[in-house]
Amino acid sequence: MSKAYLFIYDSNVGTREELKSVLNRMQRVSTWRFDVPSCFYVISEYSAQQLYDEFVSLNGTKGRFMFIEASDNRQGQMLPETWYLLTNKQHKPK
């Protein structure tokens, strides 16, 4: 079963471009998107621990970061595409 995560990081972890490359190489990541600084929305069938382990194997432990599951208890000012991804665990059809 797919889960939605927020991947939150500081600038010591890497640039957005570097992290896009890491997420694209992660076999445990189904898809992802971003629309705010220092945060990616990640979809995966794996646990936060498993995502962490794979991320560290590719990028190391530099900086501060975390994968945190996005529950249904959420609200905010986000783009419709972000809400769709978090709710449906896939990108909104074009």
What is each of the regions a protein language model found here?
Residues V13-T31:
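Short aromatic-glycine-(Arg/Gly/Cys) micro-motifs in beta-strand/loop hairpins
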Residues V29-G76:
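Short, intrinsically disordered low-complexity segments
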Residues N24, S57-N59, T82-Y84:
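General N-terminal targeting signals
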Residues M1-Y5, T61, P93:
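Short, surface-exposed loop and linker segments with low hydrophobicity and enrichment for Pro/Ser/Thr
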Residues Q49-E54, G76-K94:
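Short, low-order "capping/linker" segments at domain edges
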Residues M1-E18:
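Short S/T/G/P-rich N-terminal loop/turn motif that feeds into the first structured element of a domain
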